[in-house]
């Protein structure tokens, strides 16, 4: 838009809208009785996620969607978006508890489904996990417990969701966010197993903002889900911050490096700890291979992971 031009009115974003006007004697006369020019970033982002989900599911002829509901904020927001996009009859959530799943996680996942009025079920992965562990026992002889056992839990959940997807004809929505994708805080063929990623381009801090925005319309996400420290619950008393910086430090580093093309030194000059910046940048570069195998999803930022940013997977250069 040139300096001499001005925006007279805006139609609604991410939904069908129309405007009637007359152009007479070099003047525009708007005929609609109710025109708004309200701009709300969170509303626009939320509406974009709803429309993107609705379009992908309906235009690809899926009956509905399945969501692994952990009692955490990512799966809760994904379920709320799916509900707003498709309606309650086409959204199913599944809680898949194990030994490290907190009772309040099970309760909150159930409360979320009840608030939305969607179908919810509980399938324990304990028996499946123990069967896998028994089959692998001889191969793992003499080796201690490590991330392998944590990832196995996630992959049991992935197998469960994909089996239900095949049987029901429902699309599995993954629940990972952009912050996790950036640093590889995910399990291939586990929580990345699915057909569409609603929050693929949404940072963790924005996830919280969107959850609060959705609750401002009507309270569907239990307050405790928003207030609890995030955890993958793959080990006793596990928290995301055991492996990552707080998201209010992590997300700005990711944004500057990925979206703004800032160098390590430029990020450090913004007041961030050098050791932390170098670690985060190293994780972003290293985990390109995971992002290449992740489901496609909705773009809401200037640069998403996917077509906007594709770095070599195999190289010996280190920043």
Name what the model sees in each region.
Residues 2-71, 75-319:
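ATP/NTP-dependent adenylation/nucleotidyl-transfer catalytic domains that generate, transfer
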């Amino acid at each position: 838009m040139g300096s001499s031009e001005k925006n007279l009115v805006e139609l609604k974003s991410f939904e069908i809208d129309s405007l009637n006007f007359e152009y007479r004697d070099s003047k525009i006369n708007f005929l609609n009785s109710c025109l708004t020019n309200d701009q709300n970033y969170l509303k626009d982002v939320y509406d974009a996620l709803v429309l993107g989900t609705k379009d992908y599911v309906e235009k690809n002829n899926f009956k509905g969607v399945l969501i692994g509901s952990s009692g955490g904020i990512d799966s809760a927001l994904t379920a709320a978006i799916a509900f707003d996009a498709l309606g309650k009859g086409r959204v199913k959530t599944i809680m898949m508890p194990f030994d490290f799943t907190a009772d309040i996680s099970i309760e909150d996942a159930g409360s979320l489904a009840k608030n939305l009025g969607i179908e919810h079920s509980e399938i324990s992965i304990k028996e499946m996990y123990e069967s896998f562990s028994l089959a692998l026992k001889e191969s793992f002889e003499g080796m201690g417990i490590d991330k392998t056992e944590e990832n196995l839990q996630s992959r049991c959940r992935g197998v469960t969701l994909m089996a239900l997807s095949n049987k029901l004809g429902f699309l599995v929505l993954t629940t990972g966010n952009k912050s996790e994708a950036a640093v590889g805080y995910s399990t291939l063929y586990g929580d990345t197993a699915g057909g569409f990623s609603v929050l693929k381009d949404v940072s963790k801090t924005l996830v919280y903002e969107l959850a609060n925005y959705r609750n401002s319309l009507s309270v569907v996400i239990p307050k405790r889900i928003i207030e609890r420290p995030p955890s993958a619950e793959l080990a006793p008393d596990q928290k995301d911050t055991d492996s990552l910086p707080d998201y209010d430090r992590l997300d700005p580093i990711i944004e500057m490096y990925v979206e703004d093309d800032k160098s390590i030194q430029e990020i450090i000059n913004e007041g961030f700890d050098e050791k932390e910046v170098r670690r985060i940048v190293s994780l972003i570069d290293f985990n390109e291979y995971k992002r290449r195998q992740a489901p496609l999803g909705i773009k809401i930022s200037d640069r998403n992971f996917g077509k906007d940013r594709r770095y070599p997977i195999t190289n010996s250069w280190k920043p």
